[in-house]
């Protein structure tokens, strides 16, 4: 993500120069979806602080979802973490971030509306399905504070040698319960043994992300 990227309102900024802003990201994502036979629509509007923004609506296997490719780029969150609703906890968190954040990938209207307000001259689809949501497909979506599911999430991350684990909660009740178990009661050390664990939480997006200074 680079505000000074050349031709940053077009797909050229992405494919020719490897850097862009939200409009370039969204148009490039739309183009790739369309090349793959996936219907995709460019959506423009604003985010929480009134800043103009662009994202997409895509149709996967007959169901519509929203996807914000620029907010999925960690370099964007480094520039505007507060705008993206992410609260950092732990001095090492920035250096341990993965390159992709899935909080805004194939989400519902209800989820995207927490941070995004569309302003387009055409009706947008009501996105209600979670079937192809990243966290659902990866077993990281929690409808209750299921500690066996938590254990499986960390075991899978270790097997796949991933440096972080993000848990997505269905609602605030689940979020608060997992926060209490893993952080307040420090049960996180059952899954990431060691002296310290870096983490980031987003109550707005109902996610808890954990890293260690060494790989899982």
List the predicted regions and their residue ranges.
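Extracytoplasmic/periplasmic, Sec-exported soluble proteins
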Residues: 14-25
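Proline-rich intrinsically disordered, low-complexity coils
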Residues: 6, 39, 69, 121-125, ...
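N-terminal accessory/pre-domain segments preceding catalytic cores
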Residues: 13-14, 103-216
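Secondary-structure boundary elements
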Residues: 1-14
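Hydrophobic/aromatic-rich core segments of domains that either
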Residues: 23-107
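Acidic/polar residues at beta-strand termini and the immediately following turn/coil
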Residues: 2, 68, 200-204
């Amino acid at each position: 993500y680079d505000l000074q990227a050349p031709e940053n309102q077009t797909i050229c900024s992405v494919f020719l120069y490897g850097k862009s802003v939200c409009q370039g990201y969204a148009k490039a994502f739309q183009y790739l979806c369309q090349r793959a036979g996936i219907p995709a629509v460019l959506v423009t509007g604003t985010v929480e602080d009134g800043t103009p923004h662009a994202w997409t609506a895509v149709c996967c296997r007959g169901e519509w979802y929203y996807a914000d490719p620029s907010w999925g780029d960690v370099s964007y969150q480094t520039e505007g973490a507060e705008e993206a609703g992410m609260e950092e906890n732990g001095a090492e968190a920035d250096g341990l971030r993965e390159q992709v954040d899935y909080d805004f990938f194939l989400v519902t209207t209800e989820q995207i509306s927490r941070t995004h307000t569309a302003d387009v001259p055409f009706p947008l689809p009501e996105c209600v399905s979670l079937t192809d949501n990243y966290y659902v497909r990866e077993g990281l979506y929690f409808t209750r504070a299921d500690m066996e599911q938590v254990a499986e999430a960390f075991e899978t991350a270790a097997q796949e040698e991933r440096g972080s684990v993000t848990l997505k909660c269905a609602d605030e009740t689940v979020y608060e319960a997992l926060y209490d178990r893993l952080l307040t009661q420090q049960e996180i050390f059952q899954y990431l043994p060691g002296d310290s664990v870096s983490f980031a939480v987003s109550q707005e997006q109902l996610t808890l992300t954990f890293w260690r200074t060494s790989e899982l």
